[in-house]
């Protein structure tokens, strides 16, 4: 006779809608679906393993990828960038609009340890989502967690929303890694 845990797992997996994979052509498992969708992004070869790992370990990142890849005509590039060592910037996103719609978002992240890169990618993806949500950052500067990084009016804008989401993605990523490591030790 099978242990109750195995039976329970069998019941849980049987609850997944079998039509999902057939109708969309996408894997039904969230991590696999995220990886398939992330393949639509232009990710530098050295960052592809990190993005794939983020899909497996961070549910918030999976939601970001689903939403970003659903936006018709939006091209997203993720590459390592050169940022001054002593400078405050660790990442940036250049967004291009055509006829008011987002057409491209070029994300640059400072190379480093994987957890820092994970936080930066999640953070920058949230900036793209802010734009898709129609947030007028210029109008919000100085209010509700929106500020310029630097002294003048042309300085980049930072948001508390992107900072929090970047930290959330990194914490999910780290927690999943710790859980995986703990499972291997047992």
Predicted regions and their residues:
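Active-site recognition of the HExxH zinc-binding catalytic motif
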Residues: 119-132
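Active-site scaffold of zinc-dependent metalloenzymes
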Residues: 83-116
């Amino acid at each position: 006779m099978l242990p109750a845990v195995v039976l329970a797992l069998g019941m849980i997996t049987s609850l997944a809608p079998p039509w999902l994979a057939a109708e969309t052509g996408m894997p039904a498992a969230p991590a696999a679906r995220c990886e398939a969708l992330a393949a639509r992004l232009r990710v530098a070869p050295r960052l592809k393993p990190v993005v794939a790992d983020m899909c497996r370990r961070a549910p918030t990142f999976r939601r970001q990828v689903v939403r970003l890849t659903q936006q018709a005509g939006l091209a997203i590039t993720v590459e390592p960038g050169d940022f001054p060592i002593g400078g405050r910037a660790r990442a940036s996103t250049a967004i291009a609009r055509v006829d008011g719609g987002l057409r491209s978002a070029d994300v640059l992240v400072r190379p480093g340890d994987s957890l820092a890169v994970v936080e930066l990618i999640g953070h920058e993806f949230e900036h793209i989502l802010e734009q898709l949500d129609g947030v007028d950052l210029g109008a919000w500067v100085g209010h509700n967690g929106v500020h310029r990084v630097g002294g003048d009016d042309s300085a980049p804008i930072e948001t508390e929303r992107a900072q929090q989401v970047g930290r959330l993605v990194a914490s999910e990523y780290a927690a999943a890694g710790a859980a995986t490591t703990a499972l291997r030790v047992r």
